[in-house]
C-alpha cells in the first residue's frame, strides 16, 4: 500500500484486507488494539452475524494498520507514524474496487472450494462472501451514480449493467434481457453530489438487493 511517498509492505491475508477495504467505502475504520488490522497477518477466523449478511474477522495481533476517515467527498488516512494523506472519495472508490476485483479474480481461478461441514465455519464462510458481493456491488452502483459510467454487477449467478441516460438510471439483466428504470435516483444524487452528507448516505444505502 502506498500513501503519498510512504510505502507499507507486509505479508497478510489479502481476502480479509479486500473485505475491510470494501467496508471502508461507506464506513470509517480507526486503528484500535482490539480490532483487526487492515492487512492482518492471518484473518481466517470468521464470525458471522445472525442473518449471515456480515462477518467479523479475527486474526493475530501482527499486521499493518491505518485509519480511514471519510470527510465529505474526501478520505483521510492516518498512519501509525502520524502521517496523514487525503484523496478524493472517487479515487478511493476506484482503487478499492479494483483491488477487490483482482483478489476475487485470483480466488476464482483457484481450485473449487469445499464448504466447511462445521456449522460455525460454514456460516462464517457464507457470510464473508455475502458481505463481499453486497459491498462490491453497492460500491460499483454508487460509483456509477457519481460518474455516469456503466458498471457490470453480478448477483445470484446473473449479470447486470447499471447505467444512466437522459437523467434516468437503468438496470439491465444480461440473461433475462429485462430493463428497469429508476428516475428517482438521479434527483436524489443531484442533491447529494454537492456534499450533503445526509443525502449522500441515502444514496449509499440504496443497495443492489433492495432494487431486485
Task: Give the ranges of each region predicted by the language model.
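Short glycine-rich, low-complexity/disordered patches
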Residues: 30-45, 106-131, 150-159, 205, ...
Amino acid at each position: 500500500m502506498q500513501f503519498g511517498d510512504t510505502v507499507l509492505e507486509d505479508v497478510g491475508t489479502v481476502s480479509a484486507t479486500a473485505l475491510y477495504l470494501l467496508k471502508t467505502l461507506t464506513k470509517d475504520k480507526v486503528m484500535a488494539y482490539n480490532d483487526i488490522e487492515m492487512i492482518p497477518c492471518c484473518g481466517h477466523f470468521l464470525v458471522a452475524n445472525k442473518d449471515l449478511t456480515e462477518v467479523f474477522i479475527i486474526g493475530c495481533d501482527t499486521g499493518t494498520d491505518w485509519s480511514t476517515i471519510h470527510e465529505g467527498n474526501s478520505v483521510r488516512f492516518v498512519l501509525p507514524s502520524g502521517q496523514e494523506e487525503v484523496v478524493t472519495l472517487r479515487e478511493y472508490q476506484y482503487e478499492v474496487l479494483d483491488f477487490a476485483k483482482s483478489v476475487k479474480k485470483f480466488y476464482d481461478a483457484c481450485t473449487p472450494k469445499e464448504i466447511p461441514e462445521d456449522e460455525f465455519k460454514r456460516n462464517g464462510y457464507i457470510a464473508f462472501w455475502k458481505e463481499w458481493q453486497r459491498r462490491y456491488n453497492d460500491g460499483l452502483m454508487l460509483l456509477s451514480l457519481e460518474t455516469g459510467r456503466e458498471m457490470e454487477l453480478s448477483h445470484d449467478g446473473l449479470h447486470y449493467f447499471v447505467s444512466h441516460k437522459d437523467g434516468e438510471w437503468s438496470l439491465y439483466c444480461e440473461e433475462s434481457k429485462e430493463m428497469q428504470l429508476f428516475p428517482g435516483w438521479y434527483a436524489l444524487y443531484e442533491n447529494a453530489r454537492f456534499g450533503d452528507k445526509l443525502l449522500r448516505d441515502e444514496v449509499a444505502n440504496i443497495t443492489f438487493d433492495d432494487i431486485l
